Structure formats: structure tokens, C-alpha cells
Regions:
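Sec-dependent N-terminal signal peptides
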Residues: 3-14
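Intrinsically disordered, low-complexity N-terminal segments that are enriched in acidic
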Residues: 19-107
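A short, structured loop/turn motif at beta-sheet edges
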Residues: 40-42, 89-95, 142-145, 199-202, ...
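Terminal peptide-recognition signature
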Residues: 47, 154, 229
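Acidic low-complexity segments
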Residues: 76, 96-181
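Active-site nucleophilic cysteine motif
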Residues: 150, 154, 183-198
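Hydrophobic/aromatic-rich core segments of domains that either
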Residues: 192-280
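Alpha-helical and coiled-coil interaction segments, frequently adjacent to or embedded
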Residues: 255-311
Length: 311
């Protein structure tokens, strides 16, 4: 009988064990290397690169910038983001720029934070405030009694409404209207739709982008970005990650109220305005290097690698 009960317990615990391979709880320590190669240039250009910085959950212990091109740091108009600005010339073609971080990251839970949450009620270019989103938000939250419950109702709605799918055209821009209509997309689309509904319900909500540091290995390449969101309820910020909840349904309850420790936030917000301003305008969101030459964007190859550190 005892053996049978043990087997039953393990059977029910198995999804949790499998899911835990994707997250680190508590604290994580890692090195991340963000490296890029300047493409062949025919004229002098301007290169913008997001810089990770410390906050209450993310301590940047070291941030070493190695560049053959002179650089300076600036901040965006909101003050939320730090940005590296360089002016590479044709002679710099093929040269490499490397940013090496050593980070201690804490698992993020519901938390209080200084600042004005009301600024996160404003619409953005691809996250509008409109009667359609207001009607959806009002319908979904009709039975909720406070903003935390409203946020949970909207989280559940987006999770049920959308499916993680990067096929076709239109995904990956963080377009709330696209997400609402297509019912599919990547992390930018999931969270754009969620943030739009929160704001339509008069709940401040914000977007961030960076990396998931793989939990199932201790070194290697990272393929690209990941993004997530937070909403403000009962004087605290509540972290959510709905696209990861869609990919890992067994963690859906966890991802309402938590971001795991194996993350690095690079930038926060949408429609990011910086001086000098790119000819293309504010950054929709800011993850990869952005290079412009003669007012036109030029692709930059970037690679991202990590190594987990002992404390």
C-alpha cells in the first residue's frame, strides 16, 4: 500500500518536477555576454544598444563594455532605461563590441515600489485605449471586487483567448489589436493585449523585455528575447508571464504573481524615446542593437551567451 501511495504521489508531482526545469526559484547568479559585430559600413552611423541596470530584484555586479568605437551612455525620456550610444565609421566594419554582465537576480513576487503608477495608464502606439478594449475589460472583470481580482480575470482571459504561435505575419510587434483578433502571437503580443485590457480597466500595467536564462543547463547560447508584464493592484506591482503560462500550463498559477530568478531585464516600456533620436522614431520596444546609416536601419548581428556562476 505504501509503495502504491508513493507511486501515486510521484505521478501527480511529475508535472511540477518537469516544469521546475524551466525556472529557478529564490536566487540565480550568472554571467551574460551580449556581443555584436559592426556590419560593413559605407558611411558613419549611429548605434543604440540597451544596457541592463540594477533594480530591487536585479543586481548588476559588473558590467564591462569592450568596444573599439568610442561610446557614451544616455537615458531615455522616461528615465527607466540606460542606453549605449556609439558612432561607428566605415573603418570600424567587422569590429566587435562586447558587453559582459555578472548578475545576481532574485525571484520577483508581488511587491511595493516607489514611483507614480498612474503614468502606466497611458496608451502607446500599438497598445491603444479604445472602446473595444474597454468593453472587453468591463465584461471580463464584471464580477471582480478589486484590482487584484480584475487583473487575475484579465490574465485568465488572455491565457484562454491566445495561443503561443509564431507562424504567419503580424506577430512579434507587441500589437494589442493583432493579438485580440488573431488569438495567437509571441510574448510581445500576449502582454500587449493584457496591458491594453488592464489600462482599459484603469489598472496601471507595464512591459519589460530581456532574457530567460536557461534553467536546464549552466552555459551556452540564448536564442533571443523574452518579455513579460506587471500590473498595479492594492498598492503593489503584480508580475505576470502569460506566454510562458501558455507554454507551460502546469505553471499557470505560478506565473500569476511571479517572475523566476533566471531572468535578466534589459529595458522597460514601449515607444522608448532617446536623444539622439533614431530616424525611425521611438523604439517600439528595445532589445537588440539598432544601427542607422544615412537615416536608414542597417541589420546588426548579435549573439547572447551565458554561464551560471557559483555564489
Amino acid at each position: 500500500m505504501k509503495t502504491l501511495l508513493t507511486l501515486i504521489a510521484l505521478l501527480f508531482a511529475a508535472p511540477t518536477f518537469a516544469a521546475d526545469k524551466t525556472i529557478v526559484r529564490g536566487t540565480d547568479h550568472f554571467e551574460l555576454v551580449y556581443e555584436m559585430t559592426i556590419p560593413k559600413l559605407t558611411a558613419k552611423g549611429t548605434l543604440w544598444v540597451p544596457l541592463a541596470r540594477s533594480d530591487i530584484f536585479q543586481k548588476i555586479q559588473t558590467r564591462d563594455i569592450t568596444s573599439p568605437v568610442p561610446w557614451r551612455k544616455t537615458r531615455d525620456a522616461s528615465g527607466d532605461n540606460e542606453i549605449l550610444v556609439l558612432r561607428p565609421a566605415p573603418a570600424d566594419s567587422g569590429k566587435r563590441i562586447c558587453i559582459r554582465y555578472q548578475v545576481t537576480r532574485e525571484e520577483k513576487e508581488v511587491h511595493a515600489e516607489a514611483g507614480n503608477p498612474a503614468r502606466h495608464l497611458k496608451a502607446e502606439k500599438l497598445v491603444p485605449l479604445n472602446p473595444r478594449f474597454t468593453a472587453i475589460a468591463n465584461r471580463i472583470t464584471a464580477k471582480a471586487t478589486d484590482d487584484h481580482a480584475r487583473g487575475k480575470a484579465l490574465y485568465d482571459h488572455v491565457l484562454a483567448h491566445m495561443r503561443y504561435d509564431k507562424t504567419g505575419k503580424g506577430w512579434g510587434r507587441g500589437d494589442a489589436l493583432y493579438a485580440c483578433d488573431a488569438h495567437t502571437g509571441n510574448c510581445t503580443d500576449f502582454h500587449a493585449y493584457f496591458i491594453a485590457l488592464c489600462r482599459a480597466a484603469n489598472i496601471p500595467a507595464r512591459f519589460a523585455i530581456g532574457f530567460i536564462i536557461p534553467a536546464d543547463r549552466n552555459a551556452g547560447a540564448i536564442s533571443g528575447y523574452h518579455c513579460w508584464a506587471e500590473f498595479f493592484a492594492n498598492n503593489k506591482w503584480v508580475p505576470v508571464d502569460i506566454s510562458e503560462a501558455d507554454k507551460h500550463p502546469e505553471l499557470a498559477a505560478y506565473y500569476f504573481g511571479h517572475h523566476p530568478a533566471n531572468r535578466l531585464e534589459l529595458s522597460r516600456g514601449r515607444d522608448i524615446t532617446v536623444i539622439p533620436t533614431p530616424q525611425s522614431g521611438p523604439f517600439n520596444y528595445f532589445f537588440g542593437p539598432h544601427l542607422e546609416v544615412n537615416g536608414k536601419q542597417v541589420p546588426v548581428k548579435a549573439t547572447f551567451t551565458f554561464k551560471r556562476l557559483t555564489k
